[in-house]
A protein has these predicted regions:
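Extended basic (Lys/Arg/His-rich) segments that typically form rRNA-contacting surfaces
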Residues: 1-197
């Protein structure tokens, strides 16, 4: 993350996100597909493209990349092969950002679910960071689904809603989003207009 200073001197924490290399790879219409949507390709190097995907990109004359679909009713101004730049966004707009969170490995309940530790003394033997009871008795005789326990932490799909675009560099196709976004440096993100703003 970085920070920007606004005109009134306020320091705002921002994440710089590059939006270059995005092309329209397909257009879905209500008549043909039942809904309106844009299929966007993010150009990336790949040595293991399957044949159907490589033929798809060859047919539309685009470099191969990852595909994402975005529902939109404003599809008239787009055509296959059009390069999407930072100009599709605007300063002050609120967006929802989806990405894969950083993987933390195997974690206990204190780190993973914010449990409290047990007593350090008073008869506690080797259970200081244990989660304690995980259920009842013979009824129901099982552990409920969704029980908070230790396990793999992170590396899951996460969406952060209503993040504000505070600035943009159209020349370099970079937008500056207020706050943090999921994932590590250089990871792929999906950005769309906010549902709640």
């Amino acid at each position: 993350m970085s920070r920007l200073f606004l005109e009134d001197g306020e320091s705002v924490p921002v994440t710089a996100v590059s939006v270059c290399g995005n092309f329209v790879a397909g257009i879905k219409t209500k008549d043909k597909n039942g809904y309106n949507a844009l299929l966007i390709s993010k150009t990336e190097k790949s040595n293991n493209l399957n044949k159907s995907k490589s033929e798809f990109f060859k047919k539309i004359n685009l470099n191969p990349g990852s595909l994402s679909e975005f529902k939109s009713d404003e599809i008239e101004n787009y055509e296959i092969g059009k390069h999407l730049t930072a100009e599709v966004f605007e300063v002050g707009q609120y967006v929802d950002v989806t990405g894969t969170s950083k993987g933390k490995g195997y974690a206990g309940v204190i780190k993973r679910h914010n449990f409290s530790m047990q007593d350090a003394t008073h008869g506690n033997s080797l259970a200081h960071r244990a989660h304690g009871s995980i259920g009842q008795c013979q009824t129901p005789g099982r552990v409920w689904k969704g029980k908070k326990m230790s396990g793999h932490m992170g590396n899951v799909k996460k969406t952060i809603q209503s993040l504000k675009i505070v600035d943009m560099d159209v020349e370099n196709n970079v937008i500056y989003i207020k706050g943090a976004v999921p994932g590590f440096n250089g990871s792929e993100l999906k950005i769309k207009p906010s549902n709640k703003k």
